[in-house]
């Protein structure tokens, strides 16, 4: 990734509550802590540069806490997904690392239900480069899975690159993003605009590139 490439990151964790996670991040980032409520019980940290860091509920996380150093089941308050604002590697990676260290110090940890999502800016991509990227991911499916140690119970949230998608895209050789989008969503039900659209649960998810 180029140091100037814009990206966003979502990090799932447990061990502490969403409020405590937001407070831990505030020790690094500063800013104003707001409670957004809603079903996702979101806490929002608005920093002095105007960006917003969110700490929200995710139903896929197995909630745990520690008592006397022993992990035990916890309530949904201990489901924490950190959603970053738009970042760049050059300006923000050290700050992200500081936030993670602060969260760990506050008691956050992960288990096998936790994952990480990285969203890359697709502004400089072309339809051809997207197709090339899809083929690279498909050709190295097994290598990526082995390197990342993706466990069977997490596979439903991190599916391999679909062979039918790759075959269709290579046959059609789409020249516009609209055509790529049609191929990407082919066979799925429901609105494409849905936040938790079924197509997002893959090792590579194309929506952020297409937007």
State each model region's role.
Residues 112-116, 120:
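Short, conserved phosphate-binding/catalytic loop or strand-edge motifs used
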Residues 1-109, 124-211:
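C-terminal accessory/tail domains of diverse enzymes
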């Amino acid at each position: 990734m180029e140091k100037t490439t814009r990206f966003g990151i979502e990090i799932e964790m447990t061990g502490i509550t969403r409020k405590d996670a937001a407070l831990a991040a505030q020790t690094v980032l500063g800013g104003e802590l707001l409670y957004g409520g809603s079903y996702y019980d979101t806490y929002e940290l608005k920093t002095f540069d105007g960006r917003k860091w969110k700490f929200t509920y995710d139903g896929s996380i197995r909630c745990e806490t520690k008592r006397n150093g022993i992990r035990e089941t916890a309530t949904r308050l201990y489901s924490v997904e950190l959603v970053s604002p738009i970042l760049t590697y050059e300006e923000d990676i050290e700050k992200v690392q500081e936030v993670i260290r602060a969260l760990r110090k506050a008691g956050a940890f992960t288990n096998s239900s936790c994952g990480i999502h990285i969203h890359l800016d697709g502004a400089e991509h072309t339809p051809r480069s997207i197709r090339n990227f899809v083929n690279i991911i498909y050709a190295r499916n097994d290598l990526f899975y082995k390197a990342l140690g993706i466990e069977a119970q997490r596979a439903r949230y991190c599916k391999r690159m679909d062979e039918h998608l790759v075959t269709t895209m290579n046959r059609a050789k789409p020249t516009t993003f609209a055509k790529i989008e049609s191929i990407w969503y082919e066979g799925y039900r429901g609105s494409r605009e849905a936040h938790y659209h079924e197509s997002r649960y893959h090792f590579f998810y194309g929506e952020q590139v297409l937007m």
